[in-house]
């Protein structure tokens, strides 16, 4: 990600009071890179029950020494045996639906034929990118992301009460019950925070996919 072996050597000396030459670091890198390449291209199981897709953003130095933001895209899957496996890590300048389309295509090329449920954030076009490669996959938008995005538009003095009311929606026992609770939240807060309520209604079908499953699976999702 743009950090030279010499810079890494200085970092070890500064942070850990340990001398590690640039040549040694280069030799370690040369040994590790083939293993990383093999891991990234390894064949995967044909079917995964659930996959979580998200990005973590970091500040790194580019080739010119400038501090830039890079995203590491992570795909964590649960196979038919219930085993969790990190299927891939992908680096990009930013998170976008087009890049996720490339990620989905890579998974397909490595042997994945079906994903039952994909859990993702609310990025526009994300579900379409997934279903263009895996058309039968159910896409569940991340409720935590939705809550975080919602609370940004709620006044600080109302946030605690609003979150309590919102919990009756995503914590309901069924989709019908959740919709009834959303109507009540709308009646109470809709005039004050119409953008928030509209966001929940616009994303409703994707936010409530998990209601069709048992409580144990809902908790896992």
Where are these regions (language model features)?
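RNase H-like nuclease fold core
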Residues: 11, 15-120, 124, 128, ...
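Short acidic (Asp/Glu) and glycine-rich catalytic loops that position anionic groups and cofactors
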Residues: 83, 143, 161, 205-213
């Amino acid at each position: 990600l743009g950090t030279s072996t010499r810079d890494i050597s200085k970092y070890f000396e500064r942070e850990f009071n340990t001398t590690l030459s640039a040549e040694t670091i280069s030799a370690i890198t040369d040994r590790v890179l083939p293993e990383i390449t093999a891991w990234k291209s390894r064949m995967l199981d044909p079917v995964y029950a659930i996959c979580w897709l998200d990005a973590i953003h970091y500040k790194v130095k580019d080739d010119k020494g400038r501090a830039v933001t890079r995203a590491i895209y992570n795909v964590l899957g649960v196979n038919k045996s219930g085993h969790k496996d990190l299927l891939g890590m992908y680096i990009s300048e930013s998170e976008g639906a087009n890049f996720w389309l490339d990620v989905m295509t890579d998974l397909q090329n490595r042997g994945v034929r079906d994903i039952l449920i994909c859990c993702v954030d609310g990025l526009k076009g994300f579900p379409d990118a997934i279903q263009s490669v895996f058309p039968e996959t159910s896409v569940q938008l991340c409720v935590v992301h939705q809550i975080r995005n919602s609370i940004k538009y709620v006044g600080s003095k109302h946030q605690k009460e609003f979150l309590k009311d919102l919990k009756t929606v995503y914590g309901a026992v069924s989709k019908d019950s959740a919709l009834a609770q959303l109507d009540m939240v709308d009646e109470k807060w809709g005039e004050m925070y119409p953008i928030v309520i509209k966001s929940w209604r616009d994303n409703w079908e994707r936010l409530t996919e998990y209601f069709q499953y048992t409580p144990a699976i809902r908790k896992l999702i």
